[in-house]
UniProtKB/Swiss-Prot annotation:
Domain of life per record: Bacteria
CDD domains: Phosphoglycerate_kinase
InterPro entries reported in the protein's UniProt record: Phosphoglycerate_kinase, Phosphoglycerate_kinase_N, Phosphoglycerate_kinase_sf
Protein name according to UniProt: Phosphoglycerate kinase
Subunit and partners: Monomer.
Record GO biological process: gluconeogenesis; glycolytic process
Pfam families per the UniProt record, alphabetical: PGK (PF00162)
Binding of substrate, residues: 19-21, 35, 58-61, 116, 172
Length: 419
């Protein structure tokens, strides 16, 4: 398999798929440029070799052309980060993109407009009537799949080689993340540095396990984490359940949870997971106490109580001090750690203490030789907020992609390079 380190980009044009899906404020200023910075090593290596770059990315989830999702808003900052004046094409498919790509000289960079302005990027039909028949839907899908081939071929035609550095979209079989790779032979397609690091980190957590292995799963819904939890039960020694999922498990075991978030239709599922953990010899660690509030608000009245004795009208919004200690002790004794999802309602300052404690325990374990992988939107926000990111082994940029990889799924963006 080709690697970016071995490849010489001198005199070559590289199509680089990045994930510049960055948050913008109402004045189109970038509020967090982490994803842009993450791609810099790859982009700078190509330029240092004497290559030129055509950058493809998406921004948001537009259903067509929309100014607020235009990548033109990030050109100035990207130019500053790269130290090169980045050119911009107002399209991906039209004459402007083709002409500018053809004219690129070594050391130059061209940013294409948002790939998702085109239905062909995702390969899903747009603009169907709500009452469209199954036949109409099928015809529209067939049509977009056909035009997707032309779209992909056109993108590939701009470049001599292809670099995928967008782990955040690796779980999507989109035109620019997977299908395009077919137009380049094995020697001319490769992962960027970020993608390489992500793939190695996931591989280490799943296949090169130093024990004890502890996974901390937060988040509000058991239903969205079920496949991950089931896959992890075959791998981990300890599985810590945190966040809103706690109360579904607590209620399933007969506890009183007040008005805490709960998936009533998943109580049997929670019991089944408890049973499976027992059968596999996995230590399933659940909260014993909670920080509860009389309203879903940062300013609500709060108290601590046993997690299964929450009074009516109150809801659990974070773990309590006894649980913090239990979780921290398990984490500190671990040698491989995966953290996905905070322990409480992280958006409210008064309910971040549990997440901070977990983060600090992970940093301590890492100092003592553990490998720690933090991934999935909110847990990444946690370690960044508390200044702990530098103390863990790896912070993943991919939310959904990371979770699907941990579920054991083959990611199309990775498979396309390996083929």
């Amino acid at each position: 398999m080709q690697t970016i380190d071995k490849f010489n980009f001198a005199g070559k044009k590289a199509f680089v798929r990045v994930d510049f899906n960055v948050p913008l404020d109402e004045n189109f200023n970038i509020t967090d440029d982490t994803r842009m910075r993450a791609a810099l090593p790859t982009l700078k290596k190509i330029l240092a070799d004497g290559g030129s770059i055509i950058i493809g990315s998406h921004l948001g989830r537009p259903k067509g052309v929309a100014d607020k999702f235009s990548l033109k808003h990030i050109i100035k900052h990207l130019s500053e980060l790269l130290g090169v004046e980045v050119q911009f094409a107002n399209d991906c498919m039209g004459e402007e993109a083709a002409v500018k790509a053809a004219a690129l000289q070594p050391g130059e960079v061209l940013l294409l407009e948002n790939l998702r302005f085109y239905a062909e990027e995702e390969g899903k039909p747009r603009g169907l009537a709500e009452d469209a028949t199954d036949e109409e839907k099928a015809a529209a899908k067939k049509a977009v799949k056909e035009s997707q081939k032309e779209f992909t071929k056109k993108l590939a035609s701009y470049a001599d080689c292809y670099v995928n550095d967008a782990f955040g979209t690796a779980h999507r079989a989109h035109a620019s993340t997977a299908l395009i790779a077919k137009y380049f032979d094995t020697d001319n397609k490769m992962f960027g540095y970020l993608m390489e690091k992500e793939v190695k980190a996931v591989d280490k957590v799943l296949n090169d396990i130093q024990r004890p292995f502890t996974a901390i799963m937060g988040g509000s819904k058991v239903s969205s984490k079920i496949e991950i939890i089931e896959n992890l039960l075959n791998k981990v020694d300890n599985l810590i359940i945190a966040g809103g999922m706690t109360y579904t498990f607590t209620k399933a075991m007969g506890g009183k949870i007040g008005i805490s978030i709960c998936e009533d239709d998943k109580l049997d599922l929670a019991l089944d997971l408890i049973k499976k953990a027992k059968e596999k010899g996995v230590n399933l660690v659940l909260a014993v106490d909670a920080k509860i509030a009389d309203a879903f608000s940062n300013d609500a009245n709060t108290q601590f109580c046993a997690v299964d004795e929450i009074p009516d009208g109150w809801e659990g919004l974070d773990i309590g001090p006894k649980t913090e200690e239990i979780f921290a002790n398990v984490i500190k004794e671990s040698k491989t750690i995966l953290w996905n999802g905070p322990t409480g309602v992280f958006e409210f300052e008064n309910f971040t203490h549990g997440s901070r404690t977990v983060g600090e325990a992970i940093v301590e374990a890492t100092k003592n030789g553990a490998f720690s992988l933090v991934g999935g939107g909110d847990s990444v926000a946690c370690v960044n907020k508390f200044g702990l990111a530098s103390g863990v082994s790896y912070v993943s940029t991919g939310g959904g992609a990371l979770l699907e990889a941990i579920e054991g799924k083959v990611l199309p963006g990775i498979a396309a390079i390996n083929e």
